[in-house]
Amino acid sequence: MRGSRNLLTQRLASSRATGSSGGLKFVGATVGAVTAGAAGVAGYASYDNEFRKKLEGVIPGSRTILNYTIGEEEPPAPRLKDLRPLQYSADPKVPPKPFEPKPVKKELIGVKENLKETTEPKKIEKKPENPYIGAKTPLNPQERNEKLTESLKNHLTQAEKATKVATSAKLETIRAIEHHVQTIREAIEAGKDGDWDSVTVAHLKAKRLAEKDEKAEKLARNAVADLVTEANLGGQGETTQLNPLVPISKATAEKLSNELDEMISNVKHVDSERIFVHDYSDRVAESRRKFQMELKAVHPNLNYEDGMKIKKADLHTILAHAHLRIDQLSQKLIDSKLNEEKRIQSIIAKKKEDLLEKLRLETNAKQAAVIPEFDKKKLDAELARATAEIQKKYDEKLKEVVRTQKQLYDIEHAKDVDEAVLKERNLHSSAVGKALAQLAGIEKALSGHLQMDIENRKSKQMWLATQNLKGTVIFGNRASCCMEGRRAPLGDQMKTLLSCCGGGNSDEFVKTINTAMSKTSKVRGEYTEQDLNTRFNKVCRIGRRVAYVNEGGALAHLYSWLKSSLTIELVPKKGANESLTPAVENNFTLLTRAEQLWKSGKKSDAIRVLQLTDGATRRVAADFIADARRQHEALLLSRLLLAHAALTSIRSTY
């Protein structure tokens, strides 16, 4: 306000005519000065709303002029404390409402809204459907998770960008407020030469940035609310509730909301400093006003106005009053210091007197409590004697009471003690017996384990010997290159097997198998599988040549050879599993059937079919039949021994 008066007086002073050129110039200068003053008052009223309200209250009709010249009064900006933080919904199915600032009352703005807008019924917002709970068309859970992940990523990006923009806007607002505070301080300290135009510019800039950061904050709050809504919807889905982005999104939303709240508190703190500066300027103005009133009270005829030229005599008068006032204040300060020092000295003296009085009283009490040395010794001796007598009587009484109580206790609880002792002995006896039984079981188990280990070792050795026996029956002596050389005797391996079983006396099954095995197999060995296949093919080839020989001579052999050479071998239509009718079969068809059975792996059936041949074919196949049957018997016995060894190993495992 003082700046506006300075501006008005300066303009009035500059508009005065340097000379007295006439009444017209004086009237023009007066009108210009009034116009400039009115413009200055209007300009400052546009800056300071309080000054405008005071002006409208003092000067009637000024409100219409001000509304016409500088426009209607702007509505008050929403305060920072009216902003509310982000609201979270307690029900996860209901998304939180987007953030909206508290509406400003329309009466303050002075604008009448349309009645249609106020009477319009509010539309009831429908709750958004959750796309992650269920749908009419079934979706793949993987597709729902991917859709939720993509949506959360987009919302996270938007929320972070909006929060960053809002934070930057808040920082700019803080800088503008600090600049406004600094310009106010500089203008106040400059006094008459203060630049209040820069204060106005700084105020308008801070106001514009505050409105801008409010919009940015609203957008950021809405973006964070959308992020929380999407995370809540995803957390309700059966297949999307375990998505790792759901808790991350909620934590990020809370972090961004806290960041916005922190920036709002920073803005409030800086704005509070601006309010303090405004109070400081008011105090300075109040002090100057009081000083002016003092001057008017002392010198009523003194013309003291801002911007007016002061006479030298008046200036000396003002300086003299100021020096007098300073001397008075200095004298008052000195008197206050002296009074304070006197008060402190009186308090110290009173405290000292209190301490001395207390010390004197304590000394008197100690002197009154002193007992002569002789009386003290006599009193101590009498007191010790009386105490000893009392202690002796008390000890005797206590011993008697304890003795009586012990006798009563022994009589009452003797039976209970005996029963408790007997019960404890029985418990200890049962516990010791149980422990001894467990110990005996452990010893028996350990001895049994030793025997089982021996049996298990023997069973493994028997299994290895049986495997060697089976391999010898199937493959023979692999080092030999001739058929007879590959026949490996089985007698030594049977002796090894019997020794593994304890000499054959402890295992009757092995002993029976050893007895059932052919002596030829033990001494000479058996033909291998490959050798039997070779002999079978040779027997079939020779048997076909003599298939038509019964008991004739050489001509019959020649005839059979020619006939078999000219005979076309036909594969029978019957399967290999079909039964045979010996009456309708001949040697030729029997050999063909035997070959089919041998190739299909049914060697026992092939041997039986060869036994149905007759004549020279039977004589040719007789040795082969005996060797093949003996080899199959040895193979069967080795398999039985192998199964017996496996069973023995299982039984000996613990």
UniProtKB/Swiss-Prot annotation:
Disruption phenotype: Egg-laying defects, defective oogenesis in 23% of mutants, reduced brood size and increased resistance to oxidative stress inducer paraquat. Abnormal mitochondrial morphology with mitochondria appearing larger, thinner and connected with large pores in the outer mitochondrial membrane. Mitochondria also have elongated and curved cristae that are stacked with a reduced number of junctions. The keyword Signal does not apply. Residues 44-654 are mitochondrial intermembrane. Residues 115-140 are annotated as: Disordered. GO terms for cellular component: MICOS complex; mitochondrial inner membrane; proton-transporting ATP synthase complex. The keyword Mitochondrion applies. Belongs to the MICOS complex subunit Mic60 family. Component of the mitochondrial contact site and cristae organizing system (MICOS) complex. Sustains mitochondrial morphology probably through maintaining cristae morphology. May act as a component of the MICOS complex, a large protein complex of the mitochondria. This is MICOS complex subunit MIC60-2. It comes from Caenorhabditis elegans.
